[in-house]
């Protein structure tokens, strides 16, 4: 991800639950910007529709430049506080960053393909932690399980990293495991139970 979007933000002059609620009603997301390059936490509001569109397009590891009333600040998403019922974004934590800086992020792992006939795959880890340049954070990693036989495994060490991205995750972290379908296991248990009953 070598590009980033610029989003306008306004400094918050009011605080508290009432102020945050009024901001959300007005279509704004209360947010806090923090980091080594920020002297003190900066409280701002961001347009909800614009930010939601950015996340849909760039993902949760998106880098964005805030235009805070004329002052530019490069940031990345650290936490999204989302309402579990409405999925509306209630609050944001944004980390102030600078070009050339490296950060640790959790990147989604996508599985593609089909394993050998008579088997199924189980994904044990949905993300892996890597260190990458702030302007080159991978959107996702893809692993292929095409034709893999029973017992085959894919670990974090098997994922191909590009550029200067490095693995932070334990290399032995299990990502995908090829196993027997659960139905077959249940059928085997039933057959064993039937055999035991027949011998009694």
Swiss-Prot record:
InterPro entries: Rbsml_bL25/Gln-tRNA_synth_N, Ribosomal_bL25/Gln-tRNA_synth, Ribosomal_bL25_b-dom, Ribosomal_bL25_C, Ribosomal_bL25_long, Ribosomal_L25_dom, Ribosomal_uL5_bac-type. Keywords: Ribonucleoprotein, Ribosomal protein, RNA-binding, rRNA-binding. The keyword Ribosomal protein applies. One of its GO terms (molecular function) is 5S rRNA binding. Pfam families: Ribosomal_L25p, Ribosomal_TL5_C. One of its GO terms (cellular component) is cytosolic large ribosomal subunit. GO terms for biological process: translation. This is one of the proteins that binds to the 5S RNA in the ribosome where it forms part of the central protuberance. Belongs to the bacterial ribosomal protein bL25 family. CTC subfamily. Part of the 50S ribosomal subunit; part of the 5S rRNA/L5/L18/L25 subcomplex. Contacts the 5S rRNA. Binds to the 5S rRNA independently of L5 and L18. HAMAP family: Ribosomal_bL25_CTC. This is Large ribosomal subunit protein bL25. The lineage of its organism: Bacteria, Bacillati, Actinomycetota, Actinomycetes, Mycobacteriales.
């Amino acid at each position: 991800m070598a590009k980033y979007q610029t989003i306008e933000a306004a400094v918050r002059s009011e605080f508290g639950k009432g102020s945050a609620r009024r901001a959300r009603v007005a279509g704004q997301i209360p947010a806090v910007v923090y980091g080594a390059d920020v002297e003190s936490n900066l409280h701002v509001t961001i347009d909800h529709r614009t930010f939601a569109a950015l996340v849909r397009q760039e993902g949760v590891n998106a880098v964005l430049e805030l235009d805070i009333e004329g002052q530019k600040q490069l940031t990345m998403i650290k936490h999204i506080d989302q309402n579990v019922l409405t999925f509306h974004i209630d609050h944001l934590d944004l980390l102030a960053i600078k070009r050339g800086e490296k950060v640790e992020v959790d990147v989604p792992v996508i599985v593609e393909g089909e394993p050998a006939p008579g088997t199924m795959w189980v994904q044990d880890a949905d993300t892996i932690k890597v260190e990458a340049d702030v302007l080159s954070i991978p959107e996702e990693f893809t692993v292929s399980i095409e034709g893999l036989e029973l017992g085959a495994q894919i670990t974090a060490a098997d994922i191909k990293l590009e550029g200067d991205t490095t693995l932070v995750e334990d290399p032995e972290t299990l990502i995908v495991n090829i196993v027997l379908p659960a139905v077959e296991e249940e059928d085997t248990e039933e057959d064993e139970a039937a055999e035991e009953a027949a011998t009694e």
